[in-house]
Structure formats: C-alpha cells, structure tokens
C-alpha cells in the first residue's frame, strides 16, 4: 500500500487523523504525538519513515539523552513512535516493527517543581491590574493557583461554567471528566472584576467567544501566550526559577498538603484518576521540610 511515494508528512497526517477518529484524543494529545514523530522525522534522513530500522531509533534516543533531554521526555517520544509504528506496521505490511525491541529509558521519580507561598504571592501580585491585559492575567494567576487547574483547563474554561454566586467552577479535565472546584475569595473577587471591567474591552463586538479568558485580539487564549506571560512576571518578581503554568498547579497541591489537607481531597480537586499520582506531593512536602530543617536548625 503506498501513500504519495510514502511521504513522511503524509504518513504522520494519516496516523494522526486515524488516531483522532479511533480514540477521540484531545487536540493537545494529538499535537504531542505529532511533535514527537515529526521531530524524529526531521532527524531521520532516510527517504521514508517506512524504512526506519531499530538501530536508527536507538541512535536517535541516545542522541536525545546526550543532548540533555530528560529520560521522561525521551520515553514519551519513544511511546509516540511505538504507537505510530504499531499502526503503520499493520497498515503498510512492514516486515518488522522497528520499536518492538527498543527499551524505554529508565525513569527516576523526579519531584514536581513548585514554588514557596511567598514566591506565589509575589508572582500573583505582579500584573498591573489598571490595565485590561494585566487584570486578565491577575485573574488567571489567581484562578490557576486557587483551583489547581491544568493550563488547558484554564484557557478552555467557558464563562458559562462559572457559578459566581456559589464561588465554584465546573472544570472539564482529561478524558472529558468533569469536576467542581471552589474558587476561594481572592480568585472569585479578581475573576468577577475581570468579567465586569476587563473582558468587555477585550471582547470584540462581532465576536461570540465563550471562553472566559481572551487575547488582546478578542480571541481564545493559547497555552503558549499564558506560558510567556508567566515567564515575564517571574522576571518582574525576581523569581529565578524555570516556571511554567503547571508550576502553580504543583504549588496548589503542595501548599494544601502543607496546611493539612488529606490526599483524597487533593486528588479530587486536581482531577487525578489515581491516588498514587497525588501521593508524590507528600514527598515534595517532606523534601521541603528537610530543606528548612537543614537551613535553619542549629544542628541541621
């Protein structure tokens, strides 16, 4: 079976389309698959991805690790390539799946990057709330930290999914799972202020965008835009850490546990399907306690 002379981009496009049709994966997940396979395709100089051998994959994975990519990132890349080659091995009747005898890199259990409560406050207070964009950013930072949202959940949050009277939001998480999360007084105040004073100026007259948070052009926000804004505010706040929107989700969970919240509650608020995923935040809390003990105890 041929596909336009086995053009690599066509192979990737067809795989992504069929993956969406068969499994109904989210846009972000499909984008991650495409990125991983496309990155390998750019590295591979053969005439077609159908000609890839096991040794090519081993060389590629080895190079990634040498260039400083983490074991976790490299394992994810291999996982995407496994799915791709499992699919096309059958579809194009390949003699062998080149990923079949390739082992994943061993993963150490790394602790999530988080922020102290003091740094979170500095970050959240850094936007200029007298400006419509700054007011939007203030509301976004307050909300993502107050509710422990994933960045995709934040930027896709529909204004109709807010219950301002009760102070809760309806979140559509991974696998279209829904959960209700309380906002807290500070986040509620700034979100309401943004809706009343900032959002009307960002929303264009002919625009019917239902997402809560809008770009300066009146369209839906992107993950990249919010990531960039966080980087700017980190610099402004003199926070010398590599921050991402997910850092505030980690901070939300860690700070809840530091203040005595039970794991089951944190699991429900985060939308984790497994309690074991949430348990890593107890390790973060213990690690931080050890750091403070070593730093401040006279015999630490």
Region annotations inferred by a language model:
Residues 1-300:
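Conserved catalytic core of the tyrosine transesterase superfamily
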């Amino acid at each position: 079976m041929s596909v336009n002379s086995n053009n690599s981009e066509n192979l990737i496009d067809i795989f992504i389309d069929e993956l969406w049709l068969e499994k109904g994966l989210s846009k972000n997940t499909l984008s991650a698959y495409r990125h991983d396979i496309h990155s390998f395709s750019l590295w591979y100089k053969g005439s077609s991805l159908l000609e890839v051998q096991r040794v090519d994959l081993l060389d590629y994975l080895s190079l990634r690790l040498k260039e400083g990519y983490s074991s976790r990132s490299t394992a994810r890349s291999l996982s995407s390539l496994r799915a791709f080659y499992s699919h096309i091995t059958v579809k194009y009747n390949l003699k062998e799946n080149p990923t079949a005898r390739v082992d994943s890199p061993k993963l150490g259990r790394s602790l999530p990057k988080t922020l102290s409560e003091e740094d979170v406050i500095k970050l959240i207070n850094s936007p200029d709330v007298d400006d419509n964009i700054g007011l939007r950013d203030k509301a976004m930072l307050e909300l993502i930290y107050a509710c422990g949202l994933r960045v995709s959940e934040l930027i896709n949050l529909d204004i109709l999914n807010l219950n301002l009277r009760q102070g809760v939001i309806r979140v559509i998480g991974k696998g279209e799972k829904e959960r209700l999360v309380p906002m807290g007084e500070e986040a509620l105040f700034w979100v309401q202020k943004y809706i009343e004073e900032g959002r009307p100026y960002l929303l264009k007259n002919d625009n019917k965008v239902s997402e809560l948070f809008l770009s300066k052009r009146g369209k839906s926000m992107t993950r990249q835009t919010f990531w960039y804004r966080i980087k700017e505010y980190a610099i402004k706040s003199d926070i010398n850490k590599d921050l991402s929107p997910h850092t505030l989700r980690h901070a939300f969970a860690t700070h809840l546990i530091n203040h005595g919240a039970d794991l089951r509650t944190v699991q429900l608020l985060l939308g984790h399907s497994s309690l074991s995923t949430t348990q890593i935040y107890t390790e973060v809390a213990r690690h931080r306690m050890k750091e403070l003990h070593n730093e401040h105890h006279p015999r630490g």
